[in-house]
């Protein structure tokens, strides 16, 4: 099969289109014919060596496609089903991908492959942080930093879905997008607005940016009995800090896909390009430069 291979770890110029050996499905796995993959920040971290990786690997952490074979223990999927999954380090930049059944979710008929794959990683992190990490309840006031990113966008929607009053930070295009799509959300420009100007008013703050400055401001803006969650920080000397690690789950992905189908959630896609080494390099450069307006998608077939 064809795949995009990273010949030298840490060198994205060494990405090449290559022929690799076909995959064999094991008992608990599903073999998927790739239709779309998302370009995720974690792929860059794995590729540059900061999160593992190796020479000659295939990058990619999310996939949407068609089931072409199932292992003998698989019960929830059959050949021909449409599927989406987050498979960290799952080598998804390829014509076919192996997905453990526990990570897989069915794509509803009215959801495109691109829309489905756009939410399986960042969307899952955003949703789980609000629902399981911060355990947001109706009537609470929630602040989401980085609201226009894939994590922040779903965090906003999950908080609204829970019945919370929501504020968010963004800049540039993100400000306009959030105000257009979520008029009920108070949107701040993180470059110019002081989120703590009104004191400690938030019951829960989700920091999807991860900088020390943002985290410090978050605590200033959070009530004494409130909670703060960050996608980066793993420990903090403040009783309000929530320790939470998102575990990939097909069940959570199914919730998100069903939400897309019903209109309960939306996805925002920046671009769709054919999967190739050149386009992976292009999208990586765009992510690193900033200013991406939604999820970057690569398609197959």
What are these regions (language model features)?
Residues 85-142, 146:
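NAD(P)H dinucleotide-binding glycine-rich loop of Rossmann-like/cofactor-binding domains
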Residues 165-167, 176, 180-243, 250:
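Glycine-rich cofactor phosphate-binding loops and adjacent beta1-alpha1 units
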Residues 119-189:
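Mid-domain Rossmann-like dinucleotide-binding core that forms the NAD(H)/NADP(H) cofactor-binding site
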Residues 254-301:
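C-terminal hydrophobic helical "lid"/dimerization subdomain
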């Amino acid at each position: 099969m064809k795949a995009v291979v990273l010949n030298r770890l840490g060198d994205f110029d060494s990405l090449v289109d290559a022929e690799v050996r076909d995959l064999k499905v094991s008992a608990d796995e599903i073999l998927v014919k790739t239709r779309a993959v998302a370009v995720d920040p974690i792929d860059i971290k794995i590729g540059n060596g900061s999160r593992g990786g190796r020479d000659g690997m295939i990058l990619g952490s999310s996939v949407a496609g068609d089931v072409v074979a199932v292992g003998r223990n698989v019960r929830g999927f059959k050949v021909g089903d449409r599927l989406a999954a987050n498979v960290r380090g799952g080598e998804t930049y390829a014509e076919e991908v192996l997905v453990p059944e526990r990570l897989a979710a069915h794509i509803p008929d009215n959801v495109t492959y691109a829309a489905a794959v756009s939410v399986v990683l960042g969307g899952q992190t955003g949703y789980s942080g609000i629902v399981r990490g911060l355990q947001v309840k109706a009537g609470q006031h929630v602040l989401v930093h980085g609201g226009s990113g894939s994590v922040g966008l779903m965090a906003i929607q999950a908080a609204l879905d829970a019945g919370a009053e929501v504020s968010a930070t963004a800049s540039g295009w993100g400000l306009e997008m959030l105000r257009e799509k979520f008029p009920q959300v108070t949107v701040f420009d993180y470059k110019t607005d002081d989120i703590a100007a009104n004191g400690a008013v938030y019951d829960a703050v989700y920091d999807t940016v991860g900088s020390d400055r943002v985290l410090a401001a978050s605590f200033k803006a959070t009530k004494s009995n409130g909670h703060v969650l960050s996608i980066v920080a793993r420990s903090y000397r403040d009783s309000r800090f929530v320790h939470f690690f998102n575990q990939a789950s097909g069940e959570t992905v199914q919730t998100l896909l069903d939400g897309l189908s019903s209109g309960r959630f939306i996805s925002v896609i920046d671009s769709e390009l054919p999967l190739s080494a050149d386009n992976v390099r292009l999208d990586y450069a765009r992510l690193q430069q900033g200013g991406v307006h939604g999820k970057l998608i690569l398609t197959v077939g």
